[in-house]
Amino acid sequence: SVTVQNNATLATVDVMVASFIPFIADQLDVAADEVSFDDGRFRADGSNQTPDLLEAAAMARIEGREDLLKHTATATLDARSFPNGAHIAEMEIDPQTGVVECVKYTVTDDFGNLVHPMLVEGQIHGGIAQGLGQAVTERVVYDEDGQLLTASFMDYAMPRADNMPMVKFTNEVIPTTTNPMGMKGCGEAGTVGALAAVTNGVLDAVWEHGIHRVDMPMTPNRVWQMLSQHAVAAE
């Protein structure tokens, strides 16, 4: 989890920097209180040398300071952070075939500060695909002898690119105060939200026809039978 690993890393970096400052001061021939660490580099007034951590580690290795190359720290989170968001899936059903299609998907999340926004958006897209697959296409079938019949991707319908709608994603950043980085994490937010949004979108479409329960996966055959039993005709 980003909230645990990154804050532990940050605590370790603080220990590392504090350990390196006296060494860097000796290397630059300045007093330790003249050395600062800013934007990934050590700096000192009156010196044009600004080694980063990797360069500082190389200098320490040359000088035989192996003690500067290994650091540990403990980070304790006094409270938890909780991401939250809203997912909206616009669903369409073909009554003649039972095919369920997600035509548009909108999601707004609050994950706090992000380390890599593009990767977060990709993770949300992938999670939505997983949730859509579980809700609509993925079905496990066994025969009467317990033999798995959907044992390959020829038979087990994983979601594909053409199953995915256009996804509009926004992240409303409200940094948490429970950790120094202000991060809440995103984890499986895409999957968890998609399952409910897609299923409830289908349920909303058929509710007025007297269908008050739908079961996953909502395969064409299952949906067609459900609609036929309630005499839902094409509109």
Role assignments for model-derived ranges:
Residues 1-235:
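Cofactor-binding beta-sheet edge motifs in enzyme active sites
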